[in-house]
Amino acid sequence: MLWKGFQKPKRLAFDSESLTDKYGHFWAQPFERGFGTTIGNALRRVLLSSIEGAAITAVKIEGVLHEFQSIPGVVEDATDIILNLKQIPFRLNGDAPKAIYLRAEQPGIVTSGMIETDADVEILDKDVYIATISEGGKLDMEMRLKKGRGYVSADKNFDEDLGLGFIPIDSVHSPVRKCNYSVEAARLGQITDYDKLSIELWTNGSVNPADALGLAAKLLKDHMNIFINFEEEIEASHAEDRKPEIRNENLNRSVEELELSVRSYNCLKNANIQTIGELVQKTEAEMLKTKNFGRKSLNEIKEILASMGLSLGMKIDEHGNAVAPPPGSQPAPSYGGYPGSYGTGGTFGGGGNYGGGGGFGGDNNPGF
């Protein structure tokens, strides 16, 4: 095939120490030269424009007929209030638009935490400033919250079913606030002209960075499928021809060194699985019972363990040695098309070498 010999990353690495609901730092390597920029730019554009989110699309303020009108007893006019409303991050469960309300009659500062919602709407930041009410003033508003993608103009937010007095406003639905990517040189063995792609991602909290990145990649993949006019060939694996060697030193290593996806890592963390030794003693059935742990995460973990000569369902004997499960009970899958680890022991991004020169793609050092 035309792409025979192409180097492709095996998994996405991330910085577990800095990962939050609003920020994530991810990287992958090695890419063939030029692919880092191609993929990074495409992902960034999709992340900023096409991830679905909720935003206020229309506002009705008591006593206000248009957005340039002032409100008696309120410091801000309608325009300033609308601008402040656009800064509030929401999470909307379900696809139907929702009506939310704000009623304030006491003098003082009005914030997003004073908005009345139902169970399907979550205000992610309750401290966003909206307005200040003076003595004798009041603020009574009804707002329409709606899902969408990217930027939507006020004209497109006008619906026939909007009640009298509603002012359509332009809205920004994207939960991704900022996205940067960078490409630097990566080394594979003695070859140094591969790409390492790093992506930094900030969201408003309605979607966590890992899920946003996954959605963007899925959207790109779905659009590319129509260009594929042939059946994909499955790479032949030679791993089954080799008898895996169990490395006892791996059993005491932390699962953080496995360079798992964010979802798989969080599942192990929630299951209180700290070391590789604890992990290999779990069966497939036990792992699938873990909350949010699916078949994709299971296959990912099995592949990583297989590259280390380990598998799920193993027993640890009195000498600390891992004993493989009975033949045929849980066959360890091959890893990509590679018979074992890259270099000397360990995994891609783990404690071993990637063609020499230290760990490849750990949390803090590239290991070149």
UniProtKB/Swiss-Prot annotation:
It catalyses: RNA(n) + a ribonucleoside 5'-triphosphate = RNA(n+1) + diphosphate. Residues 243-368 are annotated as: Alpha C-terminal domain (alpha-CTD). GO terms for cellular component: cytoplasm; DNA-directed RNA polymerase complex. CDD domains: RNAP_alpha_NTD. It holds the Pfam family RNA_pol_A_CTD. InterPro entries: DNA-dir_RNA_pol_insert (IPR011262), DNA-dir_RNA_pol_RpoA/D/Rpb3 (IPR011263), DNA-dir_RpoA (IPR011773), RBP11-like (IPR036603), RNAP_asu_C (IPR011260), RNApol_insert_sf (IPR036643). DNA-dependent RNA polymerase catalyzes the transcription of DNA into RNA using the four ribonucleoside triphosphates as substrates. This is DNA-directed RNA polymerase subunit alpha. It comes from Koribacter versatilis (strain Ellin345). The lineage of its organism: Bacteria, Pseudomonadati, Acidobacteriota, Terriglobia, Terriglobales.
